[in-house]
Amino acid sequence: MVFVWDGEKVSRRKIAVVVGFFILLAYIVLAYMFTDSKLIVVPSEVVAGLAVIGIAVLMYPFLRSSGEGLAFGYISVKFVEGFLMIVAGLFFLSSGVLFDMRNPIYVWHAFIFIFSAFAFYVLLYRSRIIPRWISVWGVVACVSLLIGSVLELFFSYQLLKLFYILIMANEVFLAGWLIVRGFNLEKV
């Protein structure tokens, strides 16, 4: 099966590679942890936001048959997530109130990410286009991150970082899987 994208035929294998690359690219948003340079942070957050939206757009055709309502919810929330990342990146250019809104945006972003990631892994589990154990790992990581995010509302920010490790490891592994192995072609 071949998809037509902008008038050009694109194989499922190429889409899997691009999705894997976009997953890795979305983690460029973490650049803010290493620098305060506006020349690095702003473009990295904008690129990460666009990558998040790109993942959803590319995955939607594969996930739709596993639950149309959930797939629509997934792509909708991913657009919101990507938009928030872009806005937070642009707010980094300002000072005062807009700059101070970055932290609340990322608190909301965390919960939006958890919902979209949970929907993503449930849809991947149902579709079987990747091994189910990767999907289960993703669901467990989402639940763990939800617990960590709720705890962060009451306790130290440092605690949340521990809960991110499980989902980050899962997503980096998934990206590698998609780049190297691609989708289970029997299920697509």
Please annotate each region the language model reported.
Residues 2-188:
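Hydrophobic, aromatic-enriched alpha-helical segments typical of multi-pass transmembrane helices
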